[in-house]
UniProtKB/Swiss-Prot annotation:
PANTHER family referenced in this protein's UniProt entry, alphabetically: PYRIDOXAL 5'-PHOSPHATE SYNTHASE SUBUNIT SNZ1-RELATED
SUPFAM superfamilies: Ribulose-phoshate binding barrel (SSF51366)
Alphabetized UniProt keyword annotations: Lyase, Pyridoxal phosphate, Schiff base
GO biological process: amino acid metabolic process; pyridoxal phosphate biosynthetic process; pyridoxine biosynthetic process
Recorded family membership: Belongs to the PdxS/SNZ family.
Pfam families (alphabetical): SOR_SNZ
Binding site for D-glyceraldehyde 3-phosphate: R107
The enzyme's E.C. designation: 4.3.3.6
Name of the protein: Pyridoxal 5'-phosphate synthase subunit PdxS
Protein backbone atom coordinates (compact mmCIF):
# COMPACT_ATOMS: atom_id res chain seq x y z
CA UNK A 1 0.00 0.00 0.00
CA UNK A 2 1.03 3.59 -0.64
CA UNK A 3 0.35 7.18 0.43
CA UNK A 4 -3.30 8.25 0.17
CA UNK A 5 -4.57 10.36 -2.74
CA UNK A 6 -3.48 14.00 -2.17
CA UNK A 7 -6.96 15.18 -3.23
CA UNK A 8 -8.58 13.22 -0.40
CA UNK A 9 -5.99 14.49 2.11
CA UNK A 10 -6.66 18.11 1.08
CA UNK A 11 -10.41 17.54 1.45
CA UNK A 12 -9.85 16.26 4.99
CA UNK A 13 -7.65 19.26 5.84
CA UNK A 14 -10.39 21.60 4.58
CA UNK A 15 -13.14 19.73 6.45
CA UNK A 16 -11.70 19.68 9.99
CA UNK A 17 -10.32 22.19 12.47
CA UNK A 18 -7.82 19.83 14.12
CA UNK A 19 -4.30 18.96 12.88
CA UNK A 20 -4.15 16.27 10.19
CA UNK A 21 -1.54 13.51 10.00
CA UNK A 22 -0.91 11.36 6.91
CA UNK A 23 1.26 8.32 6.28
CA UNK A 24 4.16 7.91 3.87
CA UNK A 25 6.14 4.80 3.04
CA UNK A 26 9.39 4.26 4.91
CA UNK A 27 12.18 5.93 2.96
CA UNK A 28 9.89 7.57 0.38
CA UNK A 29 11.20 11.14 0.29
CA UNK A 30 8.92 12.29 -2.55
CA UNK A 31 5.72 11.20 -0.80
CA UNK A 32 6.85 13.28 2.18
CA UNK A 33 7.62 16.23 -0.10
CA UNK A 34 4.11 15.99 -1.55
CA UNK A 35 2.50 16.00 1.90
CA UNK A 36 4.54 18.99 2.98
CA UNK A 37 3.61 20.83 -0.23
CA UNK A 38 -0.15 20.36 0.31
CA UNK A 39 0.02 21.61 3.89
CA UNK A 40 -0.19 18.49 6.06
CA UNK A 41 0.40 19.06 9.79
CA UNK A 42 2.27 15.83 10.62
CA UNK A 43 3.83 13.01 8.63
CA UNK A 44 3.91 9.40 9.85
CA UNK A 45 6.74 7.45 8.22
CA UNK A 46 4.80 4.26 8.61
CA UNK A 47 5.53 0.55 8.50
CA UNK A 48 1.80 0.01 7.84
CA UNK A 49 2.48 1.02 4.23
CA UNK A 50 4.76 -1.08 2.02
CA UNK A 51 8.33 0.22 2.60
CA UNK A 52 9.91 2.04 -0.33
CA UNK A 53 13.47 1.63 1.00
CA UNK A 54 14.68 -1.36 3.02
CA UNK A 55 17.95 0.34 4.01
CA UNK A 56 17.25 3.98 4.78
CA UNK A 57 14.55 6.06 6.44
CA UNK A 58 13.78 9.61 5.36
CA UNK A 59 16.17 12.34 6.53
CA UNK A 60 13.49 14.19 8.42
CA UNK A 61 15.75 17.14 9.21
CA UNK A 62 15.29 18.34 5.62
CA UNK A 63 11.57 18.98 6.22
CA UNK A 64 9.65 21.68 8.06
CA UNK A 65 6.75 19.34 8.84
CA UNK A 66 7.22 17.25 12.01
CA UNK A 67 7.51 13.47 11.62
CA UNK A 68 6.38 10.60 13.82
CA UNK A 69 8.09 7.20 13.48
CA UNK A 70 7.59 3.76 14.99
CA UNK A 71 10.01 1.96 17.29
CA UNK A 72 10.11 -1.45 18.95
CA UNK A 73 13.06 -0.69 21.22
CA UNK A 74 15.28 2.12 22.45
CA UNK A 75 17.83 1.74 19.65
CA UNK A 76 15.18 2.15 16.95
CA UNK A 77 13.66 5.11 18.79
CA UNK A 78 16.98 6.95 19.10
CA UNK A 79 17.94 6.27 15.48
CA UNK A 80 14.67 7.76 14.27
CA UNK A 81 15.13 10.76 16.58
CA UNK A 82 18.66 11.15 15.22
CA UNK A 83 17.13 11.37 11.73
CA UNK A 84 14.86 14.17 12.92
CA UNK A 85 11.67 12.49 14.20
CA UNK A 86 9.72 14.76 16.57
CA UNK A 87 7.59 11.97 18.01
CA UNK A 88 8.01 8.22 18.56
CA UNK A 89 5.25 5.61 18.75
CA UNK A 90 5.15 1.89 19.32
CA UNK A 91 4.93 -0.42 16.31
CA UNK A 92 1.86 -2.24 17.57
CA UNK A 93 0.00 -4.23 14.95
CA UNK A 94 -2.45 -1.76 13.41
CA UNK A 95 -5.90 -3.04 12.50
CA UNK A 96 -5.75 -6.09 14.77
CA UNK A 97 -7.44 -4.89 17.94
CA UNK A 98 -4.66 -6.78 19.73
CA UNK A 99 -2.56 -4.63 22.04
CA UNK A 100 0.17 -7.18 22.85
CA UNK A 101 2.82 -5.79 20.47
CA UNK A 102 2.32 -2.21 21.67
CA UNK A 103 2.69 -3.45 25.25
CA UNK A 104 5.85 -5.36 24.38
CA UNK A 105 7.46 -2.38 22.66
CA UNK A 106 6.61 0.08 25.44
CA UNK A 107 7.88 -2.29 28.13
CA UNK A 108 11.08 -2.86 26.15
CA UNK A 109 11.80 0.84 25.71
CA UNK A 110 11.05 1.66 29.35
CA UNK A 111 13.22 -1.23 30.56
CA UNK A 112 16.14 -0.13 28.40
CA UNK A 113 15.78 3.45 29.66
CA UNK A 114 15.91 2.24 33.28
CA UNK A 115 19.12 0.33 32.56
CA UNK A 116 20.74 3.41 31.01
CA UNK A 117 19.82 5.57 34.02
CA UNK A 118 22.04 3.52 36.36
CA UNK A 119 24.83 2.82 33.87
CA UNK A 120 28.29 4.29 34.64
CA UNK A 121 29.08 7.09 32.21
CA UNK A 122 32.22 5.35 30.96
CA UNK A 123 30.04 2.51 29.64
CA UNK A 124 27.79 4.75 27.55
CA UNK A 125 29.89 4.52 24.39
CA UNK A 126 29.57 0.74 24.41
CA UNK A 127 25.83 1.06 25.08
CA UNK A 128 25.47 3.48 22.17
CA UNK A 129 27.28 1.03 19.91
CA UNK A 130 25.08 -1.87 21.03
CA UNK A 131 21.92 0.20 20.53
CA UNK A 132 23.16 1.52 17.18
CA UNK A 133 22.21 4.98 18.42
CA UNK A 134 23.88 8.42 18.50
CA UNK A 135 26.01 8.87 21.63
CA UNK A 136 24.56 12.28 22.52
CA UNK A 137 21.02 10.87 22.53
CA UNK A 138 22.06 7.92 24.69
CA UNK A 139 23.67 10.39 27.09
CA UNK A 140 20.45 12.45 27.16
CA UNK A 141 18.36 9.40 28.05
CA UNK A 142 20.74 8.47 30.87
CA UNK A 143 20.63 11.97 32.35
CA UNK A 144 16.90 12.58 31.94
CA UNK A 145 15.37 9.12 32.22
CA UNK A 146 13.22 9.58 29.12
CA UNK A 147 13.36 10.06 25.36
CA UNK A 148 14.09 13.59 24.11
CA UNK A 149 10.72 13.55 22.29
CA UNK A 150 7.26 12.35 23.30
CA UNK A 151 6.51 8.64 23.02
CA UNK A 152 2.99 7.51 22.07
CA UNK A 153 1.41 4.06 21.97
CA UNK A 154 -0.07 2.89 18.67
CA UNK A 155 -1.39 -0.32 17.18
CA UNK A 156 -4.05 -2.64 18.56
CA UNK A 157 -5.61 -0.24 21.08
CA UNK A 158 -9.33 -1.02 21.02
CA UNK A 159 -10.78 -0.24 24.46
CA UNK A 160 -10.54 2.45 27.15
CA UNK A 161 -8.76 -0.13 29.30
CA UNK A 162 -6.15 -0.67 26.55
CA UNK A 163 -5.49 3.06 26.41
CA UNK A 164 -5.18 3.33 30.19
CA UNK A 165 -2.83 0.34 30.25
CA UNK A 166 -0.48 2.00 27.78
CA UNK A 167 -0.49 5.21 29.81
CA UNK A 168 0.34 3.27 32.97
CA UNK A 169 3.25 1.65 31.14
CA UNK A 170 4.76 5.09 30.60
CA UNK A 171 3.64 6.44 27.23
CA UNK A 172 2.75 10.11 26.77
CA UNK A 173 -0.44 9.49 24.78
CA UNK A 174 -2.10 7.07 22.38
CA UNK A 175 -3.01 6.83 18.71
CA UNK A 176 -6.27 5.00 17.98
CA UNK A 177 -7.66 4.45 14.48
CA UNK A 178 -9.43 1.23 13.56
CA UNK A 179 -10.05 0.53 17.25
CA UNK A 180 -12.55 3.38 17.08
CA UNK A 181 -13.81 3.29 13.50
CA UNK A 182 -14.31 -0.48 13.35
CA UNK A 183 -16.28 -0.54 16.60
CA UNK A 184 -20.07 -0.53 16.93
CA UNK A 185 -20.28 3.04 18.26
CA UNK A 186 -17.21 5.03 17.10
CA UNK A 187 -18.18 8.42 18.55
CA UNK A 188 -18.96 7.08 22.01
CA UNK A 189 -15.84 4.88 22.05
CA UNK A 190 -13.62 7.79 21.00
CA UNK A 191 -14.90 9.92 23.89
CA UNK A 192 -14.44 7.02 26.30
CA UNK A 193 -10.84 6.46 25.22
CA UNK A 194 -10.07 10.17 25.67
CA UNK A 195 -11.48 10.01 29.20
CA UNK A 196 -9.50 6.84 29.94
CA UNK A 197 -6.26 8.55 28.88
CA UNK A 198 -7.05 11.58 31.06
CA UNK A 199 -7.93 9.35 34.05
CA UNK A 200 -5.64 6.37 33.46
CA UNK A 201 -4.93 5.85 37.17
CA UNK A 202 -8.61 5.92 38.16
CA UNK A 203 -10.15 2.43 37.71
CA UNK A 204 -13.62 3.59 38.75
CA UNK A 205 -13.64 6.30 36.08
CA UNK A 206 -12.35 3.86 33.45
CA UNK A 207 -15.07 1.38 34.43
CA UNK A 208 -17.68 4.13 34.12
CA UNK A 209 -16.63 5.24 30.63
CA UNK A 210 -16.32 1.60 29.47
CA UNK A 211 -20.02 0.88 30.05
CA UNK A 212 -22.44 0.59 27.13
CA UNK A 213 -19.96 1.16 24.32
CA UNK A 214 -21.27 -1.63 22.11
CA UNK A 215 -19.04 -4.19 20.44
CA UNK A 216 -15.34 -3.43 20.12
CA UNK A 217 -13.55 -4.23 16.87
CA UNK A 218 -12.80 -7.91 16.32
CA UNK A 219 -9.42 -8.89 17.73
CA UNK A 220 -6.90 -10.90 15.68
CA UNK A 221 -4.17 -13.26 16.86
CA UNK A 222 -0.75 -11.83 15.99
CA UNK A 223 0.86 -15.23 15.39
CA UNK A 224 -1.76 -16.02 12.74
CA UNK A 225 -1.04 -12.95 10.60
CA UNK A 226 0.59 -13.50 7.21
CA UNK A 227 2.54 -10.21 7.56
CA UNK A 228 3.49 -8.32 10.72
CA UNK A 229 4.05 -4.59 10.25
CA UNK A 230 6.47 -4.31 13.19
CA UNK A 231 9.16 -6.24 11.30
CA UNK A 232 9.35 -3.56 8.61
Amino acid sequence: SRMSDPKMIKEIIDAVSIPVMAKVRIGHVVEAQILQAIGIDYIDESEVLTPADDLFHINKKEFNVPFVCGARNLGEALRRIGEGACMIRTKGEAGTGNVIEAVRHMRTIQSQIRKLKVMPKEELMIAAKELGAPYDLVEYVRENGKLPVINFAAGGIATPADAALMMQLGCDGVFVGSGIFKSENPAKRAKAIVEAVKNYNNPLKIAEVSEGLGEAMTGLEIDKLDVTFAER
